[in-house]
Amino acid sequence: MQRFIKWLAVITSLDLLGVLLGGALVTKTDSGQGCGKSWPLCNGELVPSNLSMETIIELSHRLTSGSAGILVTLLCILSWKYYKHVRETKPLAILSFVFLVAQALMGAAAVVWGQVPAVLAIHFGISLISFASVILLACLIFEIDKKFDARSLIMDKKMKFHIYGVTIYSYLVVYTGALVRHERASLACPEFPLCSKNRPWPTQLHEWVQMGHRVAAILLFAWIVYAMILAIRHYKQERVVYLGWITSFILVTLQAIVGILVVYTNASLTMALLHSLFISCLFAVLCYLVMLGTRSKVNAKQTTSTENKRFFS
């Protein structure tokens, strides 16, 4: 059964990644109304008779989301049953399921009541939490903790501050990026790092949205670089923290490069999908560090309690 659950965790993670990338594809190709304003039917039909490319893309995204719902539900039930001894299993299972349902409802609302940019940005953010929760469940199922000896990890307050802070801030940056996409502001500023050679500063809404995202992303990059330097200096012996920040740095660097290429490739589909892929992976890595941070607090209390017992015995 454990082998089956491991395979299920991998397939579910890939399916949810497909949901995220599929959503980006729907937005990029303007296929949000590919099935009209009907949901869960497509143009009022179970199997649409007229299959345009927009209809195929939107319908594929719905089918992927539907299969993800089934897989996540099954994974949550099995992990709850067979891995309930692990402290984080139950909350992660609840998060995975609740946020998957929430993103499905948000997607349905976007179809029925119109493509509001702010709502679509929230839709992507909610999907990201569900994806990260499933990735963390998969890490628990594959016992990544044992491989990195992370169960007894203790971090200082400074490192935990950077982990929590970067993760929360990265989530806000994700919203600014999603807003750029849904406001169709990807090419509002044709130059980098400033808006344009003739007008370095934004003058209208779409330019402000684009430049706001750039500033937020640059700050995120700088924060991750600083946190990585701290990890290299003080946590080289704790491989999971050390490698976690190095991985985050690699992903945020790739994210930045692809973001710049989005501008210079006229927002090509490949660059847009890679942009969504790298930020999804980065957020999952940061969430794993958050889980380690919460565990560190418990480990510190247990260590203090053990030392007190030894002192008074």
Curated annotation (Swiss-Prot):
The keyword Acetylation appears for this protein: no
Residues annotated as binding heme o: 61, 123
Membrane topology: Multi-pass membrane protein
Membrane-side (Cytoplasmic) residue stretches: 1-6, 84-91, 143-159, 233-242, 293-313
Cofactor(s) needed: heme b
Active site: 58
Pathway: Porphyrin-containing compound metabolism; heme A biosynthesis; heme A from heme O: step 1/1
GO molecular function, one term: metal ion binding
EC code: 1.17.99.9
Binding locations of heme b: 213, 275
GO biological process: heme A biosynthetic process
InterPro entries for this protein: COX15/CtaA_fam, COX15/CtaA_HemeA_synthase, HemeA_Synthase_type1
Disulphide bridges, residue numbers: 35-42, 189-195
Function, as annotated: Catalyzes the conversion of heme O to heme A by two successive hydroxylations of the methyl group at C8. The first hydroxylation forms heme I, the second hydroxylation results in an unstable dihydroxymethyl group, which spontaneously dehydrates, resulting in the formyl group of heme A.
Subunit composition and interactions: Interacts with CtaB.
Family: Belongs to the COX15/CtaA family. Type 1 subfamily.
Protein name: Heme A synthase
High-level lineage: Bacteria, Bacillati, Bacillota, Bacilli, Bacillales
Name of the gene: ctaA
